[in-house]
Amino acid sequence: HKPGGGGAVAWSEFQRTAKPDGYSIIGFNIPHIIGQPMLRKDAGYETDGFKPIMWFHFTPNVLVVSKDSEFKTLEDFINFAKKKPFVGTVGGSGTYSANHLETIRLMKAAGIDLTYVPYTGTGPVIPALMGGHIKAAMSYSPVSVNYKDKFRTLAVAADERVAALPDVPTFKELGYDIVGGAFRGVAAPIGTPQAVVDKLAEAFTEANKQISKKQLDLGFVMKYSTGDEAPMLIDQMREAYGDVLGDIKNKK
């Protein structure tokens, strides 16, 4: 386990030292593995330096406010931001993370200016929102489930409503074509034989079935992707986030 750098510490060491023998595997996620190498010269790893085994779930972004917030709906929040540019503070986990990129996409889609406040992880965002230090948070769907008595979720960035949050509208329903979050999976080193990768994918698929009900209850969306589809997801999301990442890169 190698924490740090939003995954970059572990991923860079993995790509440098892991052997393609079927015994070296690592957890990874989108958009981190796309955004970091594109925006940071010192990321230490390459997006295409992994051999995906399986993507096992999707964690949609959610825009949440405290229960006593003046914002009852997404439109309330957007109207406030239009009247007071940059006054609307949105906390999130990290820089160039799924939370950060979704905040930028919301600004572009709604024509508003917000101030994104990066925290070291999801954990510190929660007391910041509870304490009124930020107006809202762009976080992940399990936060909406776990803190439903403390927070109001204005919208979820999924194609359809999340099973554990049936009363929360999607951004799409509200007129904003925003779908995003963190896709999580496991990968092997480049050079690992495909037969080995397929065998590992079978094992992970079976294990994931055993815990899928728990994941759904926590607010995750089950998205299985193995075989040829696994690397295709990276290409699809690289294209989906291309405009936002390109804008950030050009401004640096």
Where are these regions (language model features)?
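C-terminal lobe and pocket-closing loops
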Residues: 58, 142-207, 236-239
